[in-house]
A protein has these predicted regions:
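Short, contiguous pre-domain boundary segments
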Residues: 6-32
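Structural core segment of the AMP-binding/adenylate-forming
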Residues: 162-222
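Acyl-group handling in specialized metabolite and lipid biosynthesis
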Residues: 23-25, 30-33, 72-82, 106-116
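Adenylate-forming
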Residues: 37, 90-94, 121, 125, ...
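Glycine-rich phosphate/diphosphate-binding loops that line cofactor/substrate pockets in enzymes
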Residues: 94-96, 132-137, 181-189
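A short N-terminal helical cap/helix-turn-helix that marks the beginning
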Residues: 36-60, 79-104
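Short, charged, surface-exposed hinge/linker loops at domain edges
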Residues: 12, 18-20, 50-81
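Conserved AMP-binding/adenylate-forming core of the ANL superfamily
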Residues: 86, 103-158, 175-180
Length: 222
């Protein structure tokens, strides 16, 4: 067997402590859950929904039609329910786990990474959300995020969700014209970007590309 083939078959066994904290302890346990989700989807997803905080509980779990012979394809989830996904992701963890790490970020270059606790992340998300509101972004508006893989990316995503805005993460390798087209098609209300980033050893002028995209939008009457 070649070294490449050996590498493909190399397994990394987690520690017992790490494995015991897993939500699923075995493949058979996963298969059992999967079968339950297929057999009775509403019951399964109702149990999942009960693990979330709801300001108002949903009236139904799901309503859908995937048969075009019976009408237009449609899917609705948790009709009548009201919650905020960032409350579930951040706020409800602050009291007991605020000092725990929410995520680690490892940079492209060989410099120190960053670890943000739930408390730190919550503060930054609220700041970003309020900044968007100050700019006039409101519930239902589309916000494009044209950024490299930096900590501010998930912060921007969560900030949009916190105020009910729809975020669209745009691939950082797109041209200014492609970015412009997507902004126009989605009737984008705001664009969040960064000064630049590394791609390998090359510096990519993200902000310059974003500025060109905005100029293109304006030239097209958007």
């Amino acid at each position: 067997m070649s070294s490449l083939e050996q590498e493909k078959h190399h397994l990394f066994k987690p520690s017992a402590d790490f494995a015991n904290k897993s939500h699923l302890k075995s493949l058979s346990e996963y298969q059992t859950l999967y079968n339950e989700s297929i057999k009775d989807p509403d019951k399964f997803w109702s149990q999942i929904a009960n693990t979330f905080y709801w300001q108002k509980k949903p009236n139904t779990i799901s309503q859908y039609n995937l048969d075009i012979q019976k009408g237009p394809v449609s899917i609705k989830w948790f009709e009548g329910g009201k919650t905020n996904i960032t409350y579930n992701a951040l706020d409800r963890h602050l009291e007991k786990s605020g000092s725990k790490v929410a995520f680690h970020w490892e940079p492209n270059a060989s410099v120190a990474g960053i670890s943000l606790t739930y408390k730190e992340l919550h503060k930054k998300v609220c700041q970003a959300a309020n900044a968007l509101k100050t700019l006039g972004v409101k519930k239902g508006d589309c916000v494009h995020i044209y950024m490299p893989m930096i900590p501010e990316l998930p912060i921007a995503v969560l900030a949009c969700a916190r105020i009910g805005a729809v975020h669209s993460v745009v691939f950082g390798g797109l041209s200014a014209e492609s970015l412009s087209d997507r902004m126009i098609d989605s009737k984008c209300k705001a664009l969040i970007t960064a000064d630049g980033c590394y791609r390998g050893n090359k510096i990519i002028p993200i902000k310059e590309i974003a500025d060109q995209a905005l100029a293109s939008c304006e030239a097209k009457g958007f």
